[in-house]
Curated annotation (Swiss-Prot):
This is Ceramide-1-phosphate transfer protein. Keywords: Cell membrane, Cytoplasm, Endosome, Golgi apparatus, Lipid transport, Lipid-binding, Membrane, Nucleus, Transport. Mediates the intracellular transfer of ceramide-1-phosphate (C1P) between organelle membranes and the cell membrane. Required for normal structure of the Golgi stacks. Can bind phosphoceramides with a variety of aliphatic chains, but has a preference for lipids with saturated C16:0 or monounsaturated C18:1 aliphatic chains, and is inefficient with phosphoceramides containing lignoceryl (C24:0). Plays a role in the regulation of the cellular levels of ceramide-1-phosphate, and thereby contributes to the regulation of phospholipase PLA2G4A activity and the release of arachidonic acid. It is a peripheral membrane protein. The keyword Cell membrane applies. It is found in: Cytoplasm, Cytosol; Golgi apparatus, trans-Golgi network membrane; Cell membrane; Endosome membrane. InterPro entries: GLTP_sf, Glycolipid_transfer_prot_dom. An N-acylsphingoid base 1-phosphate binds at residues 56, 60, 106, 110, 150. It catalyses: N-(hexadecanoyl)-sphing-4-enine-1-phosphate(in) = N-(hexadecanoyl)-sphing-4-enine-1-phosphate(out); N-(9Z-octadecenoyl)-sphing-4-enine-1-phosphate(in) = N-(9Z-octadecenoyl)-sphing-4-enine-1-phosphate(out). The gene is CPTP. One of its GO terms (molecular function) is ceramide 1-phosphate binding. Gene3D superfamilies: Glycolipid transfer protein. One of its GO terms (cellular component) is nuclear outer membrane.
Amino acid sequence: MDDLESEFNLKVVLVSFKQCLNEKEEVLLEYYLAGWRGLVRFLNSLGTIFSFISKDVVTKLQIMDQLRSGPQQEHYSSLQAMVAYEVGNQLVDLERRSRHPDSGCRTVLRLHRALRWLQLFLEGVRTSPEDARTSVLCTDSYNASLATYHPWIIRRAVTVAFCALPTRKVFLESMNVGSSEQAVEMLNEALPFIERVYNISQKLYAEHALLDLP
């Protein structure tokens, strides 16, 4: 996990999510998790604003690394294989978190929800005018996604923290792919891949009634 401290570059995230789907449209966990490592570097580059999310994501990545290197690692090559294995062997807590608190299905679900927030936020930044306030874009995206799963006190603290976000221009330049215009071009290329991965994951979880795991 040492690479989480290295400098963020949007292109690394793009490459990972491009490689995330195979010809069967299975979500390959190696590249999914690599994409998330890139996104963690992005969150960290913005300072402490997103630390509440990035710290949780790092914990989830560590859990998945353990599963993918453990005795049942052959079942954790893709999201589809993982779901089939864990659901088929009753390794998922469907009603309350008890026997299997750190199942792969629950762990990836948390990453999946956070990915939706980032996808919406970056899409908002991509399509917004130059004078748009990133704090408003981020808050709107959060309210449409992650806020549903957080208690009021966290929602309040988070929306206050978002007010410290930089201007749209500075935010785009922090992606380290050149000018703000070049960053928008890179988002144009990257976001469809992230959205496709999200949609396939969402459908898979819905088919197995896993979207509301405790």
